[in-house]
Amino acid sequence: MAAMLTAHGHEVAFYRRTTEGVRESSVGKVAGFLSGIYSPSGVRGMREALRRERPDVVNVHNLYPFISPAALFECKKAGVPVVMTVHNFRLICPTGLFMRNGIPCETCLERGNEWSCVRYNCEHSRLKSLGYTLRNVYARWTGAYRKNVDAFACITDFQRQKLIAAGYDAQKIRVIPNFLPIPQSYRSGVGKYVAFCGRISREKGVDLILEVARRNPNIPFKLAGEVRDKELVEQIPANCELVGYLSGDALSQFYQEAAFFVMASKWYEGFPMSILEAACYGKPTIGPAHGGFTEIIGRGDSAIGKLFEPNNLDDLERQIVSLWHAPDEIARLGQMAFEKLQCEYSSEVIYKKWDSLFQELVRKH
């Protein structure tokens, strides 16, 4: 995003803290626990950055663990408007995932239910779950976000609706999706396999994809990504190939030779960029009908892929098998995906949304 703004003539300055080399040590973990709730150095650093840079607008991303939401009060004191890019669900859910035991969980949606993170030990560590909970509780009690953030930029409307349900002011919430560089055109052609690109893990629904492959030995599957769950891939069907983590030309070839992509995530995710990446190559995506997947893939005549009932193996299989045997439909959906990419997710389209928001915030201040 910084490169996009700079390309349009904006000056961009950074204030950031890194956890590199700190979180592995016991001292670092304790420091992260405490500073996530209130970080004196993070507050001081924000104050100094505001004095040094004198910005028109502050765009906040991740404040944890070494800056903390308390730093937002410094922006308020300096009279500088704040827009927060909402990458996940951390404003409501301490873990930021809306997920427990591998499936969606919205127990924390009602204000004050942050303690569910401790109750269910969502971080699989009592101390870590407590730390995550306390940061949310403290931020809510002090009003760090509600009092100091002038606009929340959600990456999906699904996120926006969840913030509203949690009591955030709807007038402060905008939807500005992610974007990526878009090619002028794409090469059409019949694909060779059903593709998945992402972490090889259960929460990504890879176990479901592998089971569909087992049931349909005549359909080839290829999965690209880092293996996070080795048990999951100990016995994979013969028609399924793990190609590992790919980048550069190898990744481009992987996308180009696929018939279509499948994302079977059991949780909502934030903004599933793989859908847009597939669209760059004119490839449709099958995804779960929840979270941001529904609005990105869409329904009806304007859809750029197919939706299946989340965590429903049989429905996922139906969608995969049906689309595999419909090359004309694959081509049509792929064309729709590329056109939607150009109309809604180009850097120019997204820049205009950001520029409009920045100008509005500056005018109001």
Please place each PLM-identified region on the residue numbering.
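A short, well-ordered alpha-helix in the C-terminal region of glycosyltransferases
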Residues: 315, 322, 329-344, 350-356
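Membrane-proximal helix-turn-helix segments that form the acceptor-binding/catalytic region
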Residues: 77, 90, 102-151
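Conserved acidic donor-binding segment of nucleotide-sugar-dependent glycosyltransferases
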Residues: 299-313, 322-327
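Carbohydrate-associated surface elements
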Residues: 158, 179
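Short glycine-rich donor-binding/catalytic loop of glycosyltransferases
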Residues: 266, 283, 287-297, 310-311
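Conserved donor-binding/catalytic core segment of Leloir-type glycosyltransferases
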Residues: 153, 178, 186-204, 210-216, ...
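Nucleotide-activated donor-binding/catalytic signature segment of Leloir-type glycosyltransferases, i.e.
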Residues: 230-249
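Acidic donor-binding loop of glycosyltransferase active sites
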Residues: 256-270, 283
